[in-house]
Amino acid sequence: GPPDCLPAGGAARSGPCKKNDSLSEAFDHLLEGLAPGFCSPEDFARARTQWLAGLLNLGRHTVTGALSTAGAKHRDWSAQYRLLQRLPVDSAFAYVQREALAATDATRPWVVALDDSITRKTGRCIPGCGWRKDPLGPHFNLNFVWGQRVLQFCAAIPSADGSARLVPVDWQEAPLPKKPSLHADAQTLQAYVEARKQANINKVAIERMAHLRTATKRPIHWVSDGRFTNRTLLRQLPENTVLIGRVRKDTKLYAPCQEQPGKILFLMMRRPPRSTPEQLRTDDTV
């Protein structure tokens, strides 16, 4: 039968909505831009229902909660769950990236923040899940949570007052390979070590940076914490991009290396450090 749908635009409302009409119409206009990426109008209608119900849901933000909010609690959910297996994720994020670029000044660099996080889960059969260090745990005690490791990129949309809000423009799951048993053979252990290297969060970030680099010809300024301010990522930044990252205050900063004929390059790495970030911060002459 036809998919369960919430009313489009301002249809079938019970009372005055004041500014809600324009808000819902604007949101519907944004959703309509995602329609070409779906295989059929029915799939788009089901996805639209879940998105709108997710905004109205006052309970847990799950598929069950969204469908219950949409009034489909006692109906067959098979089509709704099968939809999640064929969502056009790449085309959806491409549309969001275009909208985020259009909302910023085309003459200025595109500012994109990146960070890794843990999405907590409860099911033990969800792919990519494992025990991870709790980023919100106290510093004096190591806590573990069950969830997925993900990498998210958010574009900064400036406001009139000088502040900015972040809009997600890319999302990538970054699972770690399962560690083999103690009795595994050497070939299995070697394969695990190689898979662990490929699953490094910095390598995943480099791949997604290269993907976002194709979204625009404008310069891109990446903003990150200290996790991504390292040699692995800095040496493989995409063309016409800049990374603004956090570092420790006692980090040793060196002058750029200058090649000299007849000199061995690694000897120049022994030059003394110029200063540290803390010294630069407290130096009034800088």
For each of these PLM feature ranges, what is it?
Residues 19-82:
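Gly/serine-rich nucleotide phosphate-binding loop at the start of the catalytic core
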Residues 86-175, 284:
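Active-site-proximal, Lys/Arg-enriched surface segment
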Residues 1-25, 29:
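Intrinsically disordered, low-complexity and often Lys/Arg-enriched segments
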Residues 121-127, 163-168, 180-184, 234-235, ...:
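Short, conserved acidic/polar surface loops in the N-terminal third of protein domains
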Residues 57, 118-120, 226-230:
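Gly/Ser/Thr-rich loops at beta-strand to alpha-helix junctions
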Residues 73-82, 136-219:
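Electropositive, glycine- and tryptophan-enriched low-complexity nucleic-acid-binding patches
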Residues 186-286:
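An internal, acidic/charged active-site-proximal segment
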